Design a protein with these regions (language model features):
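Extended glycan-interaction surfaces of carbohydrate-active proteins
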Residues: 1, 20-51, 88, 92-120, ...
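Aromatic-rich carbohydrate-recognition surfaces in CAZymes
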Residues: 1-100, 121-129, 186, 190, ...
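Conserved, compact domain cores that house catalytic/ligand-binding motifs in diverse enzymes
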Residues: 1-16, 456-488
Length: 734
């Protein structure tokens, strides 16, 4: 709070990008939207030192948790100006179009190399939802106007559900593009899932669904070691994105722990505990510094085990223990303590002692009796709510401190019924809840009826009732990826050289492939301050001046009479001099799309292509090729990173774990030498996950066609922001 800027009004309008750093990030100048009142500087008690991270969101979230635990309204009153300045600053900078969805500017651990180009981002928006919702509560408690904060929180939640929640997929998008086609990026990192749950934007169904996305799509890496019994332990990577860049796809202890917390918050206690235990075994038991919290895991393919005594995992591990496993959730500003234990279903007993709370749990072997004992020492708390899972279909008897008491069912309980008891409980008072169970064990649904919840999602929920208990039972319903066609791998197993005929497309060439990173891509760009791709079309805000020299000398020297004869038996027409690529892009430098006439009939089209992509354009269609026939129909092949669209400067690192393309390795043509291989990664001896190729490489693709139809033309269109997609040659197999 003492590092917050208070005397620097915003006098310089959006956008305020740093021209010396290739427009990738905000210029460090007082008076810009970012470096003005409300901004929290990095160093303690210094509000005159700029830095490049948005530390505001994390600090304010910690402050609000402090108030949740203490209920200290006098301190809340002192901090009120800090909170309101922060919220105004976030709105000015990251929701300048006032749509309720916020850009993210280096505001989480995985900030390095993340950039959203003024997009609508789930994790930062979730942070702002919680901050506004609790600001409204604080305002009510201290006599300030709560209306603006209620309205903003409602607006945010409505926008999140309308635009970023994907019901057919059962999770939020990583972000929605502000520029271009305003598409959703549908493969979020774990930070999207855990921040959403941590900031309370999810209902119980959404919480379960979102964590099941982690089960299905986030890479799981087995945790094994000498002397460790193999019980299915596994840690996770933060994303499934390629190519590698620091903080984009890592195995980081804090990220794993926070995801474990999300499982507990979703009520998936066994899964949460398994992930928590896996991470502890990985770092604190099998690691090189036993009992220590490091930053990066041994299982991280890029960095390996590194850093000691790291604050991020220490803090999050504390939260997953207290708030997740033991479910201690103070709401002290409302004089309330919620205890919602996340204990594994196999545990028969557990206890916890901290300066704030004592907790005890006992369960009989036959699930006939359960008891919970809670004593808190939170001065502001007057009421205790205990939520716990039912063990059988009836409650025969429930007492609190020996006296009969009432209970209620928790609405939207998933997997098993949850019960709630509420009792007055001031600091130091022991509350002993004793339950004797009756009835029967719980059954599973025999079939999936029509009246399920979230029927379109990969998991649906069946309403269940058994005696006194009601709950929802999750049923997996795997579905194909929505709105994404299957991309057939290019294996080149059906090449017939004698039937191959190169297409003459010389008049469509508009550049040389070597120009791709020598250009300046200046428009269109966001009208707001943001993190974005540097003007040379490669790099990111941490490496804004990075570039790669694309060198096609080997390709050109291999051309004979305008033809490149390849080892695959495919001849490609390409010039030895002059322009040799037809680029398309959403940048104004090149057309969004182009058309190339075709003639006759063909069974396949072989394509020599080259262009750019990056981790922010992973698992989304970067472009599309449409081959039209004379009858007006067309065949379509999407160009998707990493399936069949690689960055010109990179060879994908693949390990079958965190870096897994789930498709055969691509054939690449090394531009500097003219060599073709689908194994350059090993042949050239790259030492790690970063495989930047000297001179760059084109990619060879094949597209099956209908041999019975006459061809009309081919259209290449770029769909993604950031990227440039180039067609260098087409060969038809008649």
């Amino acid at each position: 709070a003492a590092s917050q800027v208070t005397e620097v009004p915003n006098t310089i309008p959006h956008p305020a990008q740093d021209s010396a750093l290739a427009l990738a990030r905000s210029v460090k100048q007082w008076g810009t939207p970012q470096y003005s009142n409300g901004y929290i500087c990095r160093n303690p008690r210094r509000n005159d030192q700029m830095h490049h991270y948005d530390m505001n969101l994390c600090y304010i979230d910690e402050l609000l948790w402090h108030l949740n635990w203490t209920g200290d309204l006098e301190y809340a009153r002192r901090m009120w100006p800090v909170l309101t300045r922060h919220l105004a600053w976030e709105k000015l900078n990251y929701d300048p179009d006032n749509d309720g969805l916020y850009d993210a500017y280096a505001c989480i651990w995985a900030s390095d190399a993340l950039y959203y180009n003024s997009g609508a981002v789930t994790h930062s928006t979730a942070y702002n939802y919680r901050a506004n919702r609790l600001a409204a509560l604080i305002a009510e408690k201290i006599g300030e106007n709560s209306t603006p904060y209620h309205e903003e929180a409602d607006k945010i939640l409505k926008a999140l559900n309308a635009r970023l929640w994907m019901p057919e997929r059962g999770h939020w998008a990583e972000f929605q593009d502000f520029m271009g086609h305003k598409r959703l990026h549908t493969a979020p990192g774990v930070w999207t899932i855990y921040h959403a749950l941590d900031s309370d934007i999810a209902d119980p169904f959404q919480a379960y669904l979102a964590t099941s996305y982690v089960d299905r799509e986030i890479p799981h890496i087995p945790v094994r070691g000498e002397g460790l019994k193999d019980e299915g332990y596994a840690t996770i990577s933060t994303t499934n994105w390629l190519p590698y860049s620091w903080s984009i796809n890592n195995v980081a202890f804090a990220e794993v722990m926070h995801t474990a917390l999300a499982y507990f918050q979703a009520g998936r206690t066994d899964a949460g505990f398994k992930l928590l235990k896996s991470s502890i075994l990985d770092g604190m038991y099998l690691g090189e510094s036993p009992a220590n919290f490091g930053q990066i895991s041994f299982y991280d393919a890029a960095r390996g085990e590194c850093y000691r005594d790291f604050g991020d995992p220490i803090g999050v591990a504390s939260r997953v223990l207290i708030q997740g496993l033991y479910g201690i959730l103070p709401d002290a500003m409302n004089e309330r303590l919620l205890v919602k234990p996340g204990l594994p279903s196999a545990w028969l007993s557990a206890s916890l002692h901290t300066p704030d709370i004592d907790f005890g749990f006992q369960r009989g072997d036959k699930e006939g009796v359960t008891s919970y004992v809670v004593t808190h020492r939170l001065p502001a708390v007057r009421t205790l709510e205990l939520q716990f899972p039912a063990q059988r279909s009836k409650v025969a008897k429930l007492t609190i401190n020996g006296k009969p008491a009432t209970w209620t069912l928790v609405e939207k309980s998933i997997t098993r019924p949850m019960l709630s008891v509420v009792v007055p409980a001031s600091s130091g008072e022991e509350t002993d809840v004793h339950i004797e169970w009756g009835g029967e064990e719980f059954s599973s649904p025999a079939s999936v009826p029509a009246n399920v919840a979230y029927a379109e999602a990969p998991v649906c929920f069946v309403p269940m009732q058994q005696d006194e208990m009601k709950w929802w039972y999750p049923v997996d319903r795997p579905q194909p990826e929505a709105n994404q066609s299957l991309i057939e791998p290019s294996t080149f197993t059906q090449v017939h050289s004698a039937k191959c005929e190169p297409v003459v497309m010389d008049t469509r060439f508009n550049s040389s492939v070597t120009d791709i990173f020598r250009n300046e891509y200046l428009s269109p760009r966001s009208p707001y301050t943001t993190l974005q791709i540097p003007k040379q079309g490669i790099g990111e805000w941490c490496h804004p001046l990075h570039t790669v020299d694309i060198n096609d000398a080997g390709l050109r020297s291999s051309v004979q009479n305008g033809i490149l004869n390849t080892e695959l038996g495919i001849p490609f027409r390409t010039p030895a001099e002059g322009h040799n690529v037809a680029f398309t892009s959403l940048w104004d430098n090149y057309p969004d799309s182009l058309e190339i006439p075709l003639k006759g009939k063909a069974s396949r089209a072989y394509l020599l292509m080259a262009g750019s992509t990056n981790h922010m354009q992973c698992h989304i269609d970067n472009g599309v090729i449409r081959v039209y026939y004379k009858d007006g129909t067309c065949d379509v092949m999407f160009l998707r990173n990493p399936d069949n669209w690689p960055p010109i400067e990179h060879i994908f690192f693949e390990d079958g774990l965190a870096f897994n393309r789930h498709t055969p390795t691509l054939y690449r043509l090394r531009l500097k030498t003219g060599e073709i291989s689908n194994n350059f990664g090993e042949e050239l001896g790259f030492p790690g996950a970063s495989r930047e190729l000297d001179g760059g490489a084109a990619v060879l693709l094949e597209m099956p066609l209908n041999p019975g139809k006459k061809l009309s033309h081919l259209v290449l269109e770029t769909l993604s922001n950031d990227v440039v997609i180039g067609l260098m040659s087409i060969t038809l197999q008649r």
